[in-house]
Amino acid sequence: MISRLKTLSTSLAILGFLSTAAVPQEFDYVGDNHSWSLSCNASGYVLKSQYPVTRFFEAGAASSVTREKETLYLGRSCDASSTTMGEGKWCWANGGFFAEFESHRVSFPRQEPICPGSGRDSLACGC
């Protein structure tokens, strides 16, 4: 009986390892110490945070804090839009890419937005 339990335990441990080792990484980008997934549409790139992002918005007595999953839209014409930060711009350079808004900047150091089959569209938005 004990030998069967050891065999079962070993088998479950191996299966657990294999199941995590074979899962592809969906959140491939890191910006502002958060994990982001990247997808593309006809307008450009879409980055979605894996977990809620907490941001402080300074406005004197009317300052506020948000805590939610964010979506960043990086357009082909170098415009940027965010579900929490509003409108801005973005650009790419050898050191990575970033989106800049009125009160916040989200940087993705040493990374490049690339969508399968689209080539290097980010080069049009050089800093």
Predicted regions and their residues:
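Bacterial N-terminal signal peptides that target proteins for export
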Residues: 1-9
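Lipid interaction determinants
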Residues: 22-127
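Bacterial N-terminal signal peptides
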Residues: 9-19
